[in-house]
Amino acid sequence: MNRAWTATAQEMAATLRTALAGLGGVDLARAAEADPAVRAARLAPVLDSTGVLDLDAFGADGDEAGAAVLAVRACGAVVAPWPVTRVLAVPPAARAEVDAVFVVDGTPTHLDHADLVGRAVAVPVAGDRVHRVRALGGPKRAPLDPFRVAVALESLVAAPVPGALTRATVLDAFWTAGALGSVTRLAAGYAADRRQFGRPIASFGEIRWRIADMAVAADGLDELSAYTWDLARRGRATPADALALRVATQDAADVVLRNGHQVFGAIGLCEEHDLAVIDRHLTPVLLRPAGAQRTTELLLAEVNRHGFDALFPVAPRDVG
Amino acid sequence: MEFELGEQAEALRTRLRELLAEMLPENWAGPFSDDERVRAVADRVCQRLARERLLTIDWPAEYGGAGASVWEQTVLREEMWAHLEPRGAQYMGLSWVGPTIMRFGTEEQRREHLPPIAGGRVVWCQGFSEPEAGSDLGSLSLGATRDGDGWLLSGQKIWTSYAPIADWCFLAARTARAEGAKTHGVTIFLVPMDRPGVTVRPIDSMLGVLHLNELYFDGARVTGADVLGTVDHGWEVIKFVLGHERIGIPRYARDDRLLAELSGLDGAGGGAFGLELVRALVHARLARLLSYRAVARREAGTLTDREASTARMAAIQLDQEVASLALNALGPNGIAPSGGGELLGHAEDIYRYARSATIASGTIEIQRMLVARALTSEETT
Ligand SMILES: Cc1cc2nc3c(=O)[nH]c(=O)nc-3n(C[C@H](O)[C@H](O)[C@H](O)COP(=O)(O)OP(=O)(O)OC[C@H]3O[C@@H](n4cnc5c(N)ncnc54)[C@H](O)[C@@H]3O)c2cc1C
């Protein structure tokens, strides 16, 4: 057991965090929502110059792989408006032909930021029929889907994309963990500052209760993301491991966002507040390819098929 | 960043499972029963583990330990809990009384107490809680009044687990009125349970025998030789003890075992039961990882309330979730114990005991308070 990220990985992530802060942090997401051209004009150069999109998040090089997932986490912390996880989900061997991977469940009508990635493919959450994705125009904003782009799934691609579900799930989990870390920190800081009835609201039991639940959820997701990433790098992550992480990601987001809003009261609902933006912009990450119920059903199917690793492993079931 | 516990730790897990399979009787339901034969099993297990130098693997070599890695130690705790704590009440001596005596004890106290603990031959109980001092432990008031070169103890402790079978009590008493901080004036005494003036009264509880008791001190005499640490500064010792206890029992280990058994039941492959079951599997993995984080932080000397208490919160809530899942899955067939080698045969016992998971060793409200305080102070400093 070694729970430390390498110094190199941490440094690269810190450089990216500084660069993102220089672009305004969450303000960049706000600006991009108002004018989607901001994504390519302002964020793309930073992602290019730091080399984030070329990293192998699951390779043997611990510095590089660690830097990649910490970079994803840093982007998630400010809900940076770029499909970073979709790009990094492409295995390096496939990058000559594929620019981005979207994991889908059925035939999606929209995908986020699909206009930014030329040669994108759609990989089914269960199955291996890979399609090309064609973006039909630019983003048509919806409050909970700010960069939704209408898409059509076209011709079947010959080669499958190995490990797509695991890679995409792990990267989305790091992204979400970054966002939830931001919300938890904001809420804890606000609880200490905001006074009502002559005391900081952090002194009220109900507020402490919420902050503690947020910490358990956010910290748990951090741990499970790193654990599943480690399994994936060793080639030992099963689809059940990936879907377990997915269930945990959706759960953690629900706990953190619901309690986070409650701690802030009315102010957290305002668009000028980062919480509102993080909440809205995170939603597509949580709902694609599938919502919580469906994800749990998919997990159950995988546990039945392959079992589940634990101190006392769950055996596969004979499913006729 | 990697999460393997290491070959040695995994080899130890295999060895412990083999050993327990050999030593535990077919219908092993844990050591907390009235039946003397059952308790004899715990004694045999402890002494066998002691002979194989497994009982105190995490102690330093100079006190009979094997200097095991923190992960081997974790594996030992996981396997013991998963198998219904076959060490019985001895586990307290091993996990915190021994280490606390190493840290604060005189040479004489170490010589007297450490070998019997390491040999699995002694049961300790913890005399901290009082009727008026529960979560607010610092307000404890059991009196120790000066009497020549010693003190006379008078007052009551409560909830004292295993007191009826304990040989020694690790007792917190008040030797002076609090000055400034209310935790000032507390002293720790190591008191033999057969000392005149010490009486135990078992409390009938839904948890079963031995778990909850009252402990009365009626003029029991203690001397300087019984004091652990410094007079009036016992709070230092208590903090050390609570520090050892704070990562808590690896409850997720038994929950993992119960979930694996549940997954073999008819109906576990689908429906609402199947969905709840896989969600619990996710929660069990999360609880284990949060616990590993706390263990790693403690090993590195950087453990804070945030890591310790988030791990506790996840584990104790998991315990209740899995206990309810098990009893509900079994339905009316699970209400009475059915015995057998499977944990599921003891689902009702596990369910009853799980009611205390969020109360014992610091309630979940106190854990939440600690986490929230840690986070808000991180954000304001
Ligand atoms: C199975 C079991 C075994 C035990 N074994 C031992 C033992 O061996 N030795 C020993 O000394 N003790 C033992 N205890 C006692 C245990 O440490 C106490 O039960 C625990 O500290 C809580 O104290 P209490 O039960 O008096 O509850 P109280 O402190 O009275 O709490 C009642 C309720 O009020 C809440 N509350 C209290 N203060 C606050 C606050 N500031 N903010 C918000 N909520 C609050 C609590 O969380 C709880 O929900 C045991 C308990 C159990 C259940």
Model-derived regions: residue spans:
Chain A
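Alpha-helical interface subdomain recognition
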Residues: 1-75, 170-320
